Regions:
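NTP-dependent nucleotidyl-transfer catalytic core
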Residues: 1-194
Length: 194
């Protein structure tokens, strides 16, 4: 078999921006350091090189187009301010996809509520720090903008601390890609005809 090996490079995300700021570096400089270290580790292990190795920042148009398609298909929503202007946040609406969570065994609301009752019968579900032991939600994923806490970011409005060159203008506001859309857009670009 002829294998097409795509190894995408996430060169823009919250962690890269935060680590770069803490180190006094440009975000793209920090991303390149991580990419180089990863490639060296792969080479040390003798792993075959990829057929394609796209960087997320080189595929912004692909990501924006895919987000538009997701919104047009009723699976995403743009957050707007009180005047109806887009804020830059776009989320995937998990409730719009009936099979969402099947692969990872996550439950939709009604089933999750029933599971919560069972968990409550098992004892306290919240630990001393206030974290839900049975259904943890990353605090970074919590937002009043979301319809459901499980909705995930397709596009993120910039934080005040984000550098100006880490922001892209889109029909849904200025921001940068969410982590999941990067992989999806690049996979579609390089593997759609496979």
């Amino acid at each position: 078999y002829k294998v097409t090996f795509v190894r995408n490079v996430t060169d823009i995300d919250d962690k890269i921006l935060d680590k770069a700021a803490a180190a006094g570096q440009q975000w793209w400089e920090r991303a390149y350091i991580y990419e180089r270290e990863f490639t060296e580790a792969y080479n040390t292990l003798g792993v075959e090189p990829p057929t394609y190795e796209p960087r997320a920042t080189g595929h912004m148009i692909d990501m924006i187009d895919l987000i538009k398609q997701i919104i047009d298909n009723g699976h995403g929503y743009v957050v707007t301010d009180e005047n109806g202007n887009p804020t830059g946040n776009v989320y995937f609406d998990v409730a719009s996809w009936p099979h969402y969570g099947e692969l990872t065994h996550q439950k939709q609301t009604a089933v999750a509520d029933a599971a919560s009752e069972v968990a409550d019968a098992m004892g306290p579900s919240v630990d001393n720090a206030g974290n839900d032991k049975y259904n943890p939600v990353d605090p970074a994923d919590m937002s009043e903008d979301k319809h459901d806490p499980r909705d995930f970011a397709l596009w993120k409005a910039p934080k005040d601390s984000d550098p100006l060159d880490a922001r892209w203008n889109t029909p849904f506001g200025t921001g940068r890609p969410g982590w999941h859309i990067e992989c999806s857009a690049m996979s579609h670009r390089y593997l759609k005809d496979m």
